């Protein structure tokens, strides 16, 4: 049953960066899609040997020579995947063209060179976001995370090179404990809500709903929260949904080997809190790249801070008095939502 509730959708989008419930949509005639995890198909992981086996098997089953590429960042997750690819496989690295943005290309080149891969840089400009955002909104029927613009551009460039399949390493953070800031403590219920919401809806929306009901199923005694279960059900699905949208839109087959895995035992939170996030992945990286130091973790670079520095929404739905205290990534959510609402009003969705 499709329910129309613009206020619900706006509130959930600014808080969680997506709307998990497929049956609640912004407007009549629009229907969005959310990633569905198939738990019964996941491989159990006990050690790095198991991780290697799954990576090798999934890539072997997926790989078509001259038609398969990898999105390679400067981080360890995609670097590990790169080490199992045949020589001369195409690998793409994003580079945002703006002042002060982290450049991962030199680190990614070390991985590509180590395994004789064909390394290509994809430059990202604000003009790409202006150009691609409308067509992504038309496809998704809902506003989205900014990573989708980069993924869609990568797909378009890959297709020009004859690539039909792309491998990514998104899921390692979620399966193996890479979100170390969210795993840094046993959160109090209210503190976790404040920490997790991308934007508290009441801060930026004139009309909004309280989104705390999303957290209530995870509330524990003594005002604690099962943050691990929440992250698995909400954060993981949000990220996997972004990748699904982008690749399906561009009709590209994609593989995330890590998303096919689950740990056979609980994460060792003490190791993570002592400075070893993704301890199994770090161990495997050191095995595959014995001559390289483990790099610091950084998110996929996006120059939203620079590109949206002076952005102020014009629509009546938004409280503009708070816009300047938002980060660039937070402003992206408002920019994308405003673009979506404008397109709807013009009949362009």
Each model region followed by its residue ranges:
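A conserved beta-strand->alpha-helix junction
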Residues: 105-139, 170, 214
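RNA-binding accessory domains that recognize and position tRNA/RNA substrates
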Residues: 1-67, 345-349
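Hydrophobic transmembrane helix bundles of membrane-integrated enzymes that assemble
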Residues: 1, 7-9, 26-41, 54, ...
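A mobile, often basic/glycine-rich helix-loop segment
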Residues: 177-204
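Acidic, carboxylate-rich catalytic segments that either coordinate divalent cations
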Residues: 2-11, 161-162, 321-349
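Mid-to-C-terminal catalytic subdomains of enzymes
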Residues: 166, 171-187, 229-324
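Phosphate/ATP-binding catalytic cores across multiple sugar-kinase/actin-like superfamilies
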Residues: 48-70, 157-163, 238-241, 338-339, ...
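ATP-dependent adenylation/pyrophosphate-handling site
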Residues: 66-115, 120
């Amino acid at each position: 049953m499709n329910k129309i509730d613009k206020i619900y959708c706006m509130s959930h989008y600014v808080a969680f960066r997506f709307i998990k419930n497929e049956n609640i949509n912004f407007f009549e005639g629009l229907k969005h899609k959310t990633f569905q995890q198939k738990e019964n198909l996941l491989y159990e992981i006990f050690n790095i040997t198991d991780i290697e086996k799954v990576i090798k098997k999934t890539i072997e089953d997926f790989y078509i020579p001259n038609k398969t590429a990898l999105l390679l960042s400067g981080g360890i997750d995609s670097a590990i995947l790169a080490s199992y690819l045949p020589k001369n496989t195409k690998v793409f690295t994003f580079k945002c063209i703006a002042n002060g943005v982290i450049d991962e290309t030199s680190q990614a080149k070390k991985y590509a060179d180590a395994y004789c891969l064909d390394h290509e840089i994809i430059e990202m400009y604000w003009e790409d976001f202006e150009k691609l955002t409308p067509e992504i909104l038309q496809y998704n029927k809902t506003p989205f995370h900014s990573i989708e613009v980069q993924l869609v551009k990568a797909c378009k460039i890959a297709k020009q090179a004859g690539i039909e399949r792309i491998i990514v390493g998104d899921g390692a953070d979620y399966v193996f404990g890479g979100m170390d800031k969210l795993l840094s403590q046993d959160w109090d219920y209210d503190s976790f809500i404040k920490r997790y919401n991308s934007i508290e809806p009441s801060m930026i929306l004139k009309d909004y709903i309280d989104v705390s009901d999303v957290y209530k199923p995870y509330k524990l005694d003594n005002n604690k929260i099962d943050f691990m279960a929440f992250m698995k059900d909400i954060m993981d699905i949000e990220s996997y949904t972004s990748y699904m949208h982008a690749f399906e839109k561009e009709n590209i087959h994609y593989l995330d080997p890590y998303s096919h895995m689950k740990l056979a035992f609980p994460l060792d939170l003490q190791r993570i809190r002592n400075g070893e996030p993704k301890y199994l992945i770090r161990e495997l990286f050191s095995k595959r790249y014995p001559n390289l130091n483990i790099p610091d973790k950084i998110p996929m670079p996006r120059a939203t801070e620079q590109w949206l520095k002076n952005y102020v929404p014009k629509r009546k739905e938004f409280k503009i008095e708070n816009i300047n205290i938002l980060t660039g990534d937070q402003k992206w959510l408002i920019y994308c939502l405003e673009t979506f609402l404008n397109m709807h009003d013009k009949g362009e969705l």
